[in-house]
A protein has these predicted regions:
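AMP-dependent adenylate-forming
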Residues: 3-26, 69, 102-116, 121-138, 146-148, 168, 286-289, 395-396, ...
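Conserved AMP-binding/adenylate-forming core of the ANL superfamily
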Residues: 14-44, 59, 91, 163-169
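Conserved AMP-binding/adenylate-forming
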Residues: 23, 40-84, 187-193
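Conserved AMP-binding A3 loop
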Residues: 26-28, 144-173
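Conserved pre-ATP/AMP-binding loop-to-beta segment of ANL
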Residues: 133-150, 157, 182-188, 194
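Conserved AMP-binding/adenylation subdomain of ANL enzymes
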Residues: 159-187, 197-236
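Gly/Ser/Thr-rich phosphate-binding loop
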Residues: 209-211, 239, 249-316, 320
Length: 507
């Protein structure tokens, strides 16, 4: 990957690498910032300090992207941290990883508070001295960490997913094996926060071919900004979450994006009816449904939906997730980790070059989530995704829902148990229930139910806001004197949700 980016900088020095907040940055300008960061890290940090924090704000800054590659080119891994997330959550990430330095484009109150609370050094990138451009690719073991992303944890402690350089390079190689027709003239959409793994594809892939990544403006409605960016900048490669389509659907009759060559979706279920409607908006675009958890480096299965096909594959209305990418494999298991035959529904498990070696310093979680199978005299390690699926006779995989209490909203993975964890902390009540549902617009939302005779909506909302990122906050909270129970004595979650649906007309 670094060799590809180095070649892009050398071959296309005057072409644009990024468009951020109304400004273009050329590959040469980007390389200069990378080199300043690289020089600083190599001069001011020890080899033992192999993980560097970078800020990942809602508002994009060129320095944040340069910090990623400044870290990688200096032989270190990076950890994106959003300073706007709760201080306690960010502090747990810093405590787990032991990072001592955080790179940022702008120092604000959140960054200052984070640094003081955790006694770490903050480096403001614009203040770094100039340095000669240095694009030498470091000699680093491929099993060294490229980045660690932290996902929601059911105990209230974020869990780290380390991705190695081998994992990342394998993903890039697998992506290019598809033979997509992309080059330095293409324009990529980058709509994601840097703490979300899908962003890795949106900024790395264009940099590898000398193309330009277009980020969204911080102001305004995010999904509306997606459409504006697609249209005004004639985006050719659009990576999106399906929620974007749900938002734009009322305007499909007015949308015609002839320049889009590829529409790639990941992070949520892509429904066939809205995919078909979207295909009329992008008449020249291939539509790809991609699947993959953070543990398998961005995505690792793909299916191309094509309106010219006699019949596209789907299950319960959701487009197939397709076949494993180059270097990856997938199986369906039942009880006792037994591999099931085609057509049988079970848990989707993944193995291959993109798979993480395990959670960051969490052996108990690793034992729970990974298992090994002897195959051809070799031991293969598989990751249990927690997703229900089956594989058809053609080898295409179909997603059939979650096996546990985990969902995705706008691509962000959310453990409903984490929301319940903090709700219990506030109420001292054992009975709380965070329930996900689909709104009339087709977007996933969360309603929190609390068994309590006393309603304290404002206080609870403030408490949750202090402990959870914005995307995890419930869209509604209901206080109920006594929860309904089913015949097994368990909380009747369907009954709870029905009460809200009947009251508010939720679909």
């Amino acid at each position: 990957m670094l060799e590809r980016i180095k070649n892009s900088i050398l071959n296309f020095p005057g072409r644009n690498a990024f468009y951020i907040e109304g400004k273009f940055y050329t590959y040469t300008e980007f390389a200069k910032i990378i080199s300043r960061i690289r020089y600083y890290l190599q001069s001011n940090t020890s080899k033992e300090e192999n993980l560097i924090g970078i800020t990942a704000r809602h508002k994009n800054e060129i320095e944040n992207y340069a910090a990623i590659y400044g870290s990688l080119f200096s032989g270190k891994g990076y950890i994106p941290i959003n300073p706007a997330n709760p201080l306690d959550r960010n502090s747990k990430i810093i405590e787990q990883t032991g990072i001592k330095t955080i790179l940022t484009g702008t120092i604000d109150e959140n960054v200052i508070e984070l640094a003081r609370y955790n006694n770490i050094k903050v480096v403001e990138i614009p203040g770094l001295p100039d340095a000669d451009i240095n694009l030498d690719v470091p000699e680093v073991d491929e099993n060294e960490i490229a980045y660690i992303l932290f996902t929601s944890g059911s105990t209230g402690v974020p869990k780290g997913v380390p991705i190695t350089r081998k994992n990342l390079n394998s993903f890039i190689d697998a992506f290019y094996s598809f033979g997509y027709e992309i080059n330095e003239h293409d324009r990529f959409l980058q709509m994601f926060e840097l703490t979300f793994d899908f962003s890795v594809a949106c900024y790395t892939i264009p940099l590898c071919v000398g193309a330009c990544a277009y980020t969204l403006p911080a102001d305004g409605i995010k999904f509306a900004n997606v459409y504006t960016t697609l249209e005004e900048h004639e985006i050719t490669f659009a990576c999106m979450v399906p929620s974007v389509l749900s938002y734009l659907k009322p305007y499909f009759d007015e949308i015609k994006l002839d320049k889009v060559k590829y529409s790639l979706f990941c992070g949520e279920i892509l429904y066939e009816d809205i995919t078909s409607a979207w295909s009329e908006c992008v008449p020249n675009s291939k539509i790809i449904n991609a699947y993959g958890p953070t543990e398998a480096t961005v995505f690792c299965l793909t299916y191309e939906w094509n309106k010219a096909k006699a019949q596209n594959k789907s299950f319960n209305g959701g487009v197939a997730i397709g076949k494993p990418m180059q270097g990856m494999d997938a199986v369906i298991i039942g009880e006792d980790n037994r591999i099931l035959a085609r057509g049988q529904k079970g848990e989707l498990c993944l193995t291959g070059n993109q798979l993480t070696n395990g959670y960051w310093r969490d052996p108990a979680k690793n034992t729970e989530s990974f298992f090994s199978i002897q195959e051809g005299g070799r031991e293969k390690t598989f990751y249990k995704t927690g997703d229900s699926a089956f594989v058809d006779e053609d080898g295409d995989f179909m997603f059939a829902g979650r096996l546990d209490n985990q969902i995705k909203i706008q691509g962000f993975r959310i453990e409903l148990g984490e929301i319940e964890h903090f709700a219990r902390q506030f109420t001292n009540s054992a009975n709380v229930a965070a329930i996900a549902f689909q709104s009339k617009l087709g977007t996933m939302q969360i309603h929190l139910f609390v068994e309590s005779p006393k309603a304290a909506l404002q206080e609870m909302t403030e408490f949750l806001r202090k402990n959870l990122p914005e995307y995890m906050l419930p869209t509604g909270i209901s206080f109920i004197p006594a929860f309904p129970l089913n015949s097994n004595g368990k909380i009747d979650r369907k009954g709870l949700l029905s009460s809200v649906q009947d009251k508010n007309g939720i679909s």
